[in-house]
Each structure stands twice: as structure tokens, then as C-alpha cells.
Amino acid sequence: MKISVKNTQYPSEKEQFAYLKDCGFDGCIFTFGHYFSRTGVFGDIYNVTDEQIEKHFTMLREEAEKVGFVVCQTHSQFSGHPKRYDSMDEIVKREEACIKATHYLGSKFCVVHPVFTANRRYDIEMKENFDAAVDFYKRLIPALEKYDVYCCIENMWHCDPVYGHICATILSRAKEMVEMCNVLGDRFKICVDVGHGLLTQDDPCEMVRIAGDKLGCLHAHDNDGILDLHAFPFTPHGKPCGMSWKPLRMDWTAFMKALDEVDYRGSLCFELGAPGPEPIWKAGYEYMAAIARYLTTLRNAEY
């Protein structure tokens, strides 16, 4: 089972793959905010050509291949909040560019957040938001088919406007994710984000089982059940002071066994960035890789 981590752009765009390989990783999740957001390298999206995208991301794939490194999945630039853009047309244009780049990077999976409606928290606006997300995702199908890429929908969270804590929203529940994939068709898979599941009190192990053969990729990270910390596995401990309820804690052994149950063949991807100040980055990445290697030994099957 390959282990991967979020790409870093360090020590440079071209050298990042060799750096992460030297830290112990086999591949990465390549994030596109640096490229296709409004302030990105290709931020002027209406004037970016297919040839520019092909040239740049083919170059990066070749740099990765030189050191035996792979892009296991990508993450599009869209946060899920349409008000940050002029129109849905602009959002779709940027997401199509991410799909093209995914193809040229040599990956099959691009994680794309759903559209959020303004009040989609708990069970509010469930149908309205589901339908809006379906309409958005359907517009990506031509690009997904043309470039042979699968869109992975991710379980999300929102904030309670009164109490300020994290709560469930669109696609927080695995059953809703499966339902959406069934509506959208074979070009859509599921990305189980472990940390997000903990925050919405959805057991990531059970989410994997419900996703079944629709599970396309993973975002593995830990937290205290309160904040989206994107912490190393095993790091958050104990119950925060003053809390009357016990946050959901991650059972990593059970999680790896759940991957066996559904015959998951993808990579174990840590959605984690560089830890701390630059002088300790390499040690931090090496520690992350050691954790990831340990977790892979908990599986019964070898992939």
C-alpha cells in the first residue's frame, strides 16, 4: 500500500517530489489552490490555454517519475462556497482546469468539494443543497470523461452560527455520499476524510464500510473532536477541560481493518502540511512517513 502526503512546493516546485520521496513517501496529494485559484499561477482562468496546462503539469509528472514518485490524487481549488466567485460558470471553468491537470499529472482521482447553500447545517436545506451539488457536479462530467478522471466527493463540515462549534452539513454522512454517487454515475467516487468524520461524530470506519466499492481515496489526519487540526495520527489525547460530552476518538487499527473489509486498493494519504518551522520539516515528514508505514502493517491484505 502506497503512502502519500500533501505536496509542499519545497524546496522548489520541481524538487518537491524528490524531497518527499527522500522523507519516505511514495506519492502525494497534489493541491491546485496554488495554480487555479484567482491568485494562482494560472489564476486568469479565461486566458489559460489547454496547451499551457498540458505543458506545465506534464513537466511536473516527469519530474516525479524521475525519482519514482507518483501523484496518487489531486485536490481542486474550490472551497465549496459559490459567493467567493462571480458565477458558477467561473467555478466550473476552474474545476475543469483542475481535472485536465490531474490527467497530465498521471492521476485518476480529483477531490472536489460540493457546493454549500447558505444555511445547510444539521438537517436544514438537505434537498436544496443536494440538488444544487448534483447540478454542479454534473457540469464536470464531460471533462471527467474526456480526461479519464474520477471525481471524489468529500465528507464536509460547517459551523453552528449560534454556538460556534463544528456541525454536520452537505455530504457529512456516508449514506448521502453513496446516494449522490448513485445519482451522478460511474465517474464519481467517495473520499473519506477521517478528521472531518470525527468532527461531525461520524465513525470513519463505518463510513468506509458504507462507501464500499465506491471508496476512491482517503484524507487521513487526526484531531481532538473539536477543531479541524489536521494533526498526525495518535497525537490528540484526552477530553478537553470543561466539556460535558466525549468527542469521537479515532481507532486507527479498526480503520485499517475496515479498508481490508472493502478491499481498498488505493494509497494511504495524509492530508498534512509541513510541520512547524522550516528547520524541522524534514524530521516531521519522516515521522509522518514512519506513522504511515506502521499503519499499513495493520492491514491483513498486502496491496
Give names to the regions the model predicted:
Residues 37-51, 122, 161-170, 241-244, ...:
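Short, flexible/disordered intra-domain loops and linkers
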Residues 29, 73, 111, 152, ...:
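Conserved beta-strand positions in the central sheet of alpha/beta enzyme cores
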Residues 148-152, 191:
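Conserved Rossmann-fold SDR core element
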Residues 1-4, 9-26, 65, 92, ...:
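Histidine-acidic metal/acid-base catalytic patches
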Residues 138-142:
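Histidine/acidic residue-rich metal-binding segments in metalloenzymes
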Residues 9-11, 32-34, 77-80, 116-118, ...:
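Active-site-proximal loop/turn and secondary-structure-junction residues that shape catalytic pockets
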Residues 115-126, 153-168:
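Active-site-proximal beta-alpha loop/turn segments in soluble metabolic enzymes
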Residues 26-135, 146, 252, 260, ...:
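Structural motif corresponding to the early beta-alpha repeats
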